[in-house]
Regions:
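Metalloprotease/metallohydrolase-associated module, dominated by Zn2+-dependent proteases
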Residues: 2-13, 20-26, 30, 47-177
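Short alpha-helix carrying the canonical HExxH Zn2+-binding catalytic motif
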Residues: 29-41
């Protein structure tokens, strides 16, 4: 398992902050510019890492759950270049809507596969998401979900973040540790 490349949170005074760990970036597949842009984008979208959006359960669309308002996690396997610098793809507001808007982009790159766009509350290859499911057993309310492929890249990233018990996500999934 690789170390987490970065995370963002808020301190006890509600001041948002983010970290990128250069040593971990060297070990994994993402370069530091992708990790930095990932955390910067998510700091802008949810500075204190405390927002949730109601949406369908990934496997039972009739059941509603609360998804973390993370702008990069679902597309964390995708990046693009700006003047030769790799940066993270990110979600747009339409991704957080339960209704599909014909012709709308739900992520900045606007694709999952050629000719196929990313559906609301879905995951691109290499991505992951976390959601709160009130029907889940106690201690398992926070539930991970990975892309429809093998999910290994997203799983490795999420496992690293969960192991980092100092992050808000780590504290949510390991209360009392």
């Amino acid at each position: 398992m690789s170390a987490t490349e970065g995370y963002h949170d808020g301190n006890n005074a509600d001041v948002p902050f983010g970290f990128v760990f250069l040593d971990a970036c060297g070990e994994g597949s993402d370069c530091w510019t992708v990790a930095l842009s990932h955390e910067a984008i998510e700091l802008v979208g949810d500075p204190l890492n405390n927002l949730l959006v109601q949406g369908p359960h990934p496997t039972d669309h009739r059941h509603l759950v609360f998804h973390q308002f993370e702008l990069c996690d679902a597309v964390s396997g995708e990046c693009y270049e700006i003047e030769g610098v790799k940066v993270q793809n990110f979600l747009l507001p339409g991704w957080f809507s339960r209704k599909v808007v014909e012709g709308a982009r739900n992520d900045f790159m606007g694709r999952v596969q050629p000719g196929e766009s990313l559906a609301p509350f879905s995951i691109a290859a290499g991505g992951y998401l976390m959601f709160w499911d009130d029907r889940a057993p106690e201690g398992r309310k926070w539930t991970p979900h990975f892309d429809a492929g093998d999910g290994m890249a997203g799983r490795a990233k999420l496992d690293a973040k969960l192991a980092a018990r100092f992050s808000r996500l780590g504290r949510r999934c390991h209360p009392g540790d």
